[in-house]
Amino acid sequence: MTTPPGTLPVDDSAVHTVREIAQQPALWREVDRIVGASREALDAFLDPLVARGDLRVVLTGAGTSAFAGQVLQPSLARHLGRRVDAVPTTDLVADPRGCLAEDLPTLLVSFARSGDSPESVAATALADQVLSEVHHLVITCNEQGRLAREHTRRPRSHVLLMPAASNDRGFAMTSSFTCMTLAALLALGKDARDGVAERLARAAESIIEDGAADRTAGALVDRAPERIVFLGSGPLKGLAEESALKVLELTGGTLMAVAESSLGFRHGPKAVLNERSVAVVYVSNDPYTRRYDHDIVAELRGNLPVGSVVAVSAESGAGTEGADAWPLPGLGDVEDAALALPAVVYAQLIALRASQARGLRPDNPFPSGEVNRVVQGVTLHSLND
């Protein structure tokens, strides 16, 4: 294993995954430029829709792409002052009449790394079939993907392409997730535009480049946990879901990973804890919400051995005593949907190191093909049969 200056340690089992984690700050700056250059066309497409009082916004994707919607939903609902729902494509395809029961004018925001997953195109087609009026904002990392090709130059569609490098070659979505999430926040959350991408990039660079985060993630993995719990509130619950999925994917399902909200964890999911568990709590920047995050940190301190509870936080001081504090420097005033982007780097590093500790190859933890980078094996059925 080598350690090039200013980067993460890398070996041939994780060439793509390491590069794709490390490239995120640079790609976020590129996303900011892309959205800025597309601003006139984006506003021409979005502003008349958002001005309509009856518009419903639906954020959709599968797996990690669905969690992008979950991170964004509370924030965009506030920014837009209207109903915003996060509905996975996997739900929408299985039950389109239920997910789209109200025949309202709808903006369907589709997130897709490749755009070639069976549900990606099917979800947009079913929305067209079920609803009287639907408009599509497609945010994807693959210009050649079927989703991008089918919606390019359609009159009610706008395709926003991410940097080519964000079409992750590693098994797990890393830079694709953060780039698409940032792009949607910049495109739709107008109050979040000014300078936020640069601030997030600088924070992530400080996490990645000094090596401390990688060492602390490695130290957590060295505890040989049997179970890992990720908790967060509001947008950070979506981040907790994405974090747990990263660990499950890169460890080939050998490390049990659970996600919940800080309040919801007590209502049954807390049963997962044993003496070989570790917990990561994402602490909200909202002064009201983070009280609940502080409460669960304090409770977990009493349940788990010293060193087993991590608080990922932009704040310093009260509320996280007794927990290992993993910082998000200079971001104490940003909204939680934006905070999620540098915060997820910690989960990506945990997943990477846990995978390697198990002798797996993070770039392909399922060499026999039990789980695929682009989902296979889905049979799509006609709605009218």
From Swiss-Prot:
One of its GO terms (molecular function) is carbohydrate derivative binding. CDD domains: SIS_AgaS_like (cd05010), SIS_GlmS_GlmD_1 (cd05008). GO terms for cellular component: plasma membrane. Residues 46-206, 217-365 form the SIS domain. Pfam families: SIS (PF01380). The keyword Hydrolase applies. Its EC number is 3.5.99.-. Keywords: Carbohydrate metabolism, Hydrolase, Repeat. GO terms for biological process: carbohydrate derivative metabolic process; phosphoenolpyruvate-dependent sugar phosphotransferase system. It is an enzyme of class 3 (hydrolase). It catalyses: D-galactosamine 6-phosphate + H2O = D-tagatopyranose 1-phosphate + NH4(+). Belongs to the SIS family. AgaS subfamily. NCBIfam families: agaS_fam. PANTHER family: D-GALACTOSAMINE-6-PHOSPHATE DEAMINASE AGAS-RELATED, N-ACETYLGALACTOSAMINE PERMEASE II COMPONENT-RELATED. Catalyzes the isomerization-deamination of galactosamine 6-phosphate to form tagatofuranose 6-phosphate and ammonium ion. This is Putative D-galactosamine-6-phosphate deaminase AgaS. The gene is agaS.
